[in-house]
Amino acid sequence: MPVADTSQHISGVAERYASSLFELALEEGAVPAVTADLDRFQAMLDDSGDLKRFISSPVFSAEEQVGAVQALATKAGFGAYFTNFLKVVAKNRRLFALPGMVKAFRIIAAQHRGEVSAEITSAHALTKAQENELKAALKGVTGKDVAIAVTVDPSILGGLIVKVGSRQIDTSLRTKLSTLKLALKEVG
């Protein structure tokens, strides 16, 4: 099953790698395992500034990158498919595109399940109950099940930014304050 057209915000490199990983995982019946590994990797990436710097640094040779991702995968207990995927990405010097690959994989997997992907940005972490309410509300709007990816960004101060496909709803306090500031400038 060829998969395409995930998003305009994902690079072609990231989409091609993610599509290849998804198709392999689908053929091997390993989509849930690979998804779990991707989620754990994303959590590691979110928590570690060193890991972020490593994947974005052109200073390391391909051999050093392969060795480092092998050690990371072994320590994290990633499955064989995801470990081999990381090694191929490192060998081809594409580690910088890993965040986009994770995002593209999630979108492709959601499309395969007949879901719509939504990116939620919140000033604070959402509870499971809030996530479920949000999913239900978005399902009412889209008519499809919704897979959400929540990002915490304290700079929005409050509220949410919701992106579904090419649509965005910005109810953040930062945006409301900016709008108010512009309105006051026009009056004064």
Swiss-Prot record:
Keyword Ligase tagged: no
UniProt-annotated location(s): Cell inner membrane
Keyword vocabulary terms for this entry: ATP synthesis, Cell inner membrane, Cell membrane, CF(1), Hydrogen ion transport, Ion transport, Membrane, Transport
Assembly and oligomerization: F-type ATPases have 2 components, F(1) - the catalytic core - and F(0) - the membrane proton channel. F(1) has five subunits: alpha(3), beta(3), gamma(1), delta(1), epsilon(1). F(0) has three main subunits: a(1), b(2) and c(10-14). The alpha and beta chains form an alternating ring which encloses part of the gamma chain. F(1) is attached to F(0) by a central stalk formed by the gamma and epsilon chains, while a peripheral stalk is formed by the delta and b chains.
Protein name: ATP synthase subunit delta
Task performed by this protein: F(1)F(0) ATP synthase produces ATP from ADP in the presence of a proton or sodium gradient. F-type ATPases consist of two structural domains, F(1) containing the extramembraneous catalytic core and F(0) containing the membrane proton channel, linked together by a central stalk and a peripheral stalk. During catalysis, ATP synthesis in the catalytic domain of F(1) is coupled via a rotary mechanism of the central stalk subunits to proton translocation.
InterPro entries documented for this protein: ATP_synth_OSCP/delta_N_sf, ATPase_OSCP/d_CS, ATPase_OSCP/dsu
Family of this protein: Belongs to the ATPase delta chain family.
